[in-house]
Amino acid sequence: MALDRTTKGVLLGFASFAVFSFSDACVKLIKGQLPPYESAFFGAVFGLSILPFLLRKGDHWIDILSTTNLPLWLVRFLAYPMGVIGSVTAFTHLSMAEAFVLIFLQPAYITVMSVFFLKERVGFRRWSAVAIGFLGVLIVLRPGFRPLSIGHLGALFAGLGGAVSVVAFRAARGKEKNVSLFGAGILGGVIVCGLLTFPSFTPPSGDQWAKLAGYGLLAAVANVLTMWAARQAPAAYIGPTQYSQMVWAILLGYVLFGDGADLPMVAGIVLIVASGLLTLIRENVRGTPLPPSVAGERHVAAALVPNPA
């Protein structure tokens, strides 16, 4: 029986976020043997393979550097490396489930930033979703009851970097070409992380090269799958599929790294996922463009935020 377009889109969405999860597992398998900015650099280099898929008829490679708003372009250029270095740090030092659940607070950051930078009006329900999300984080972190690490700080920067990118996407929506919107971030990853890498460059081993390639190329494949998904189904159906990453995080964490999840962790996961879903539902009702995948600062907004430019 032939599947309708919406069903195909949703299935592609689930597939894309499964691939994203395997990408993050690849960088975690490096186990911190390379600096996070070096892993981020090579991930961005391999991620350049997505750029041809962003080119539309009439686009040119030079359009990556073209912009009608240089400050916003620079924000995207800097936000991506901040987010991806943070996510690599988080996945290196935390369990996959804990890293994901903290990065998944990104929709709450977006709500708060949208008030100040986009002058959006936020009602009681969206503020309630923010409060639920922060409560979930407190339950996961349990400050004062367990030590916090650089991995938790990395997850914070990953979420903030992704949120800054999404707010910049929304501010530039309809005014920039997709290849400029997302090329700025990928270039930022290559250049900024490259500048941090080369003064103390550690040559990867053969095994590490394979993991770095898996990290960057799988993320690129996942981005392409998400774009295909968004061509089949509305963003309102694709957006929630990103939360399937929590299932993959728990499964991969257990199988590959022997991670477990205690009761407070599960409770925090439920609250943070509920917070994100509430935000997605409210933004769909309001007609606000939905954010991209929140884990690992992924540039899939090309699919979830259609751009006529």
Segments from the language model and where they lie:
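C-terminal transmembrane-helix exit sites in multi-pass transporters
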Residues: T89, P107-S128, V247-V266
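Hydrophobic transmembrane alpha-helices of multi-pass small-molecule transport proteins
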Residues: R125-L141, G162, P264-E283
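Glycine-/small-residue-enriched transmembrane alpha-helix faces in small-molecule transporters
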Residues: M1-E38, P147-A171, P291-A309
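Helix-helix packing/entry segments at the starts of transmembrane helices
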Residues: F100-L105, A172-L187, N223-Y254
